């Protein structure tokens, strides 16, 4: 359902980004806002128009927030995972998974820990000059 996907993926991300940004600005603290998008938001995917549009919106939202909040020392980045081994991907038929993994340069799905490591890096001071990245 178009409206539900947009409400959860895009509006939900907007509301959390807005609240975090306002809280950080009003406290005078610097910080890092990290939004989760998807590679589908960048390259699209058959049968996922609503999902692709919502995740592309997250990318644009994050890049704009980075520009607006940077002067306050607040970094905003988005992570665009590809196909990750989750309960959702376990439901995909094996024939389809074979086709998907054949298109992945590494030849296999990523693990949730792969995404978590990127998020942890972006949240740390080690990424202190990275903002607006996807």
Swiss-Prot record:
Gene3D superfamilies: NAD(P)-binding Rossmann-like Domain. GO terms for cellular component: mitochondrial matrix. InterPro entries: NAD(P)-bd_dom_sf, Sc_DH/Rdtase_CS, SDR_fam. It is found in: Mitochondrion matrix. GO terms for biological process: estrogen biosynthetic process; fatty acid biosynthetic process; protein heterotetramerization. NAD-dependent 17-beta-hydroxysteroid dehydrogenase with highest activity towards estradiol. Has very low activity towards testosterone. The heterotetramer with CBR4 has NADH-dependent 3-ketoacyl-acyl carrier protein reductase activity, and thereby plays a role in mitochondrial fatty acid biosynthesis. Within the heterotetramer, HSD17B8 binds NADH; CBR4 binds NADPD. This is Estradiol 17-beta-dehydrogenase 8. It comes from Callithrix jacchus (White-tufted-ear marmoset). The gene is HSD17B8.
